[in-house]
From Swiss-Prot:
Its EC number is 1.4.1.2. PANTHER family: NADP-SPECIFIC GLUTAMATE DEHYDROGENASE 1-RELATED. Pfam families: ELFV_dehydrog, ELFV_dehydrog_N. SMART domains: ELFV_dehydrog (SM00839). This is NAD-specific glutamate dehydrogenase. Substrate binds at residues 90, 111, 114, 165, 381. Coiled coil: none annotated. The gene is gdh. It catalyses: L-glutamate + NAD(+) + H2O = 2-oxoglutarate + NH4(+) + NADH + H(+). It comes from the Bacteria. GO terms for cellular component: cytosol. One of its GO terms (biological process) is glutamate catabolic process via 2-hydroxyglutarate.
Amino acid sequence: MSKYVDRVIAEVEKKYADEPEFVQTVEEVLSSLGPVVDAHPEYEEVALLERMVIPERVIEFRVPWEDDNGKVHVNTGYRVQFNGAIGPYKGGLRFAPSVNLSIMKFLGFEQAFKDSLTTLPMGGAKGGSDFDPNGKSDREVMRFCQAFMTELYRHIGPDIDVPAGDLGVGAREIGYMYGQYRKIVGGFYNGVLTGKARSFGGSLVRPEATGYGSVYYVEAVMKHENDTLVGKTVALAGFGNVAWGAAKKLAELGAKAVTLSGPDGYIYDPEGITTEEKINYMLEMRASGRNKVQDYADKFGVQFFPGEKPWGQKVDIIMPCATQNDVDLEQAKKIVANNVKYYIEVANMPTTNEALRFLMQQPNMVVAPSKAVNAGGVLVSGFEMSQNSERLSWTAEEVDSKLHQVMTDIHDGSAAAAERYGLGYNLVAGANIVGFQKIADAMMAQGIAW
């Protein structure tokens, strides 16, 4: 590894020892950039990496709101505007009790590289709050969203920072936040948020985008390996929008998802989650707020494994779609023992660094990184921004076609970058290199301003 890269990683580990998720993602990204950094000694001369691992701006604020009983609660809100060298900040808002500064910085850092990979002019950001929408009434969620936007509005704009949804933030929450934004600023600037309802500027295919895009990426991997999706079995984790979109597109292309997981365990459906009834039931489960994947097992009479993860099932493809660090070294060893060939990260950083290194050492396994695989979500968000700017609405076929093409290009570009630096078919390193190079070029061209 490059001495410069080693030094910056060591500095980050020391300075941010209390931010483990952020340190983990910095280590994962920078550790693959040695060949690029060594080829450009000018990067060290202008402290490029040191600047790149520090956000351009971190906004932290209190969010007071009142519940239905008149009791006042206070949550913490965040917006980490990590890197805007190539365009307005772009990235989701997450409402979950687990939200903290380390997770926001990790997601913002990853987002910068992901947005760069899309080829669209978007910088990287992430935000959210430790507010838990589960168990709250619709009015309570509305009041919280309004309180959150009452502070956030001053930091965002169509050409400044364009938030979107993420875990705990769907079209409902985006709608409430946009309503408050419109009231405060006094104008119809619908390009300020993406993930909106169709009635006021949302894009077709946005709910399915991350899942669809992940499968299009797998399709490109299959083409490279002279293989096909037809007949493949897939283990999915999660049962939200991403897993739903993936299951839907897998079925359409002739493969079948056979697992889903939740906080309570996982289900195994050997016949596959391929029918319209089963795929639509995933949406019903999520909308119920019960957060139990066992409901699927009860309805369709399949096996449920309480408190377990699906990584011990023998399948062709693994696609973790749930949350960060879902696959540790122990789980990775189970995956390898089952001779799984394709390990496709879909959730943000779903694999511990230790497990990722182990999987990448397997000679017969293809490992694909989340920042490339799940780029479809932010890609269609970028398409939504374009439609809002043009005052036009694209057809579903047009959006899907563009999504398919760009996801294929992301795979092909990553593979080519890895080959160019003598790394073989290393999609993890290739994605990091491509994402980094565009940001680095922009930062170098703009001088030492950030």
